[in-house]
């Protein structure tokens, strides 16, 4: 798989089955990396995933017709925080991780976000060096650590809080 084989586009309601499949895969493969759980989302009807795609910005990376990566974006609510957005739900299938899919997804979501916000924030599990390194290479800076932010199977996970000033890049 090469960089040229990948198409990045916004997912639509019609992509709900593909989105549900990759989202559940992400939650099962890396349960420590997400606030939600496989069991909770697996029990949801397909309409929940379709509605999420209709009301949220979720970008997908496609190799032909296969969805190989996803990332979400949301503008913060509230008048005083409307200049900020959040990158969420990032996942790239293992077979696509060396094809710059993650990089292309983050670049695409930043380009999309730049039209709406000045600052994009994210959180990532401290131990996820590969993701942290990717975000840092793309201009995200650490601004804090949330201790014991997630608890999975009796273990606590700290989150590194990162942000990128889109008005400067």
PLM features: residue spans?
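Conserved catalytic-core motifs of GNAT/GCN5-like acyltransferases
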Residues: 121-125, 136, 141-157
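Acetyl-CoA-dependent GNAT
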Residues: 10-95, 106-108, 112, 165-169
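Conserved GNAT acetyl-CoA-binding A-motif
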Residues: 113-123
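Glycine-rich acetyl-CoA-binding "A-motif" of GNAT/NAT acetyltransferases
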Residues: 66-69, 130, 156
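Terminal substrate-recognition subdomain of acyl/acetyltransferases
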Residues: 2-5, 13, 158-169
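Conserved glycine-rich acetyl-CoA-binding loop
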Residues: 80, 89, 93-107, 125-133, ...
């Amino acid at each position: 798989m090469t960089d040229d084989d990948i198409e990045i586009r916004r997912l639509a309601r019609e992509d709900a089955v593909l989105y549900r499949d990759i989202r559940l895969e992400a939650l099962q493969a890396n349960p420590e990396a997400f606030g939600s759980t496989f069991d909770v989302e697996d029990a949801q009807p397909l309409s929940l995933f379709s509605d999420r795609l209709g009301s949220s910005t979720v970008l997908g990376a496609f190799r032909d017709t296969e969805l190989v990566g996803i990332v979400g974006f949301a503008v913060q609510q509230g008048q005083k925080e409307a200049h900020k957005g959040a990158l969420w739900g990032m996942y790239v299938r293992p077979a696509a991780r060396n094809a710059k899919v993650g990089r292309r997804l983050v670049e695409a979501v930043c380009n999309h976000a730049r039209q709406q916000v000045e600052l994009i924030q994210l959180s990532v599990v401290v131990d996820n060096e590969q993701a942290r390194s990717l975000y840092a290479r793309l201009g995200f800076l650490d601004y804090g650590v949330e201790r014991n932010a997630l608890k999975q199977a009796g273990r606590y996970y700290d989150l590194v809080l990162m942000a990128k000033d889109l008005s400067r890049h």
